[in-house]
Amino acid sequence: MKIIYNIPNIIRMAGMERILAIKANYLAGLTGMEVVIITYEQKNLPLAFDFSDKIRFYDLDIDYAACRGKNIFWNKIRRIIYTKRHQRRLEEILLKEKPDITISMMTGREREWLYRLKDGSKKILECHFSYFSYQNVKGIINRYKIKRFLNKIKYYDRLVVLTEEDRKDWGRKDNIVVIPNALTFYPKESADLSIPRVIAVGRLSAQKGFDRLIAIWAEIEPYFPDWKLTIIGSGELQDTLERQIG
């Protein structure tokens, strides 16, 4: 069996990229399994995680960042051109590789149209975010785009979510399955719970909501002065969060 994963790039040490590395390496080590990973904006940068030598990579070299200029008209034209280029290059690889399953990690542009490619493979969306992250987007145009995308999910063979709660949030769709993230280690000892400390671990980005955690902690801290909050992680909002902490 051959599986192809689609993801924009693997240049950050983030959760989704880590899970992809874990699963791809595991699958590539199984007898009779082939794994291919397709990016479109890797830009010759090194991979953030180690991957098995058995895994093959393609980069489609599509620079969607060029569609974010000041001229709205040319942005639209470029987006159309780059999308067509993306579709053509990806379909060429799928027809060449003949995968059994093609997966979109749901952060790339291909999620909008992957189901339309007629290469014969099963098309799967793999969601690593909560349903509500798609519901809480700001702006009329962005909300319209999200609604349009959500209406396309029914055309995919499967939508993979992480938990039973996620499955319920997505509603009554027959093509939803639950596959939790892999656990690569299990603690040998349990904490003795003697230290009054809360630890939060994650990428310091808007998606993780550390700003809300800090705001809530500021309200409850006076009632629990012995407790400490420790945030572990890095990301684009580190300076902003440090200023919020003061």
PLM features: residue spans?
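Glycosyltransferase donor-sugar binding loop
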Residues: I37-L45, V201, K228-L241
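N-terminal strand-loop element at the rim of the active site
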Residues: N6-M13, Y26, L30-I77, D169
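Membrane-proximal helix-turn-helix segments that form the acceptor-binding/catalytic region
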Residues: R88-E92, I140-L159
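Donor nucleotide-sugar binding/catalytic pocket of nucleotide-sugar-dependent glycosyltransferases
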Residues: F149-K188
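Short His-centered aromatic/hydrophobic patch
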Residues: H86, S104-E110, C127
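Active-site proximal beta-strand in glycosyltransferases
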Residues: I101-S104, Y115-Y134, V160
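A conserved mid-protein helix/loop that constitutes part of the nucleotide-sugar donor-binding site
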Residues: A14-I22, P196, A200-E219, E236-E242
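Short hydrophobic "strand-cap" motifs at the C-terminus of beta-strands
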Residues: N6-P8, L162, A182, V198-Q207, ...
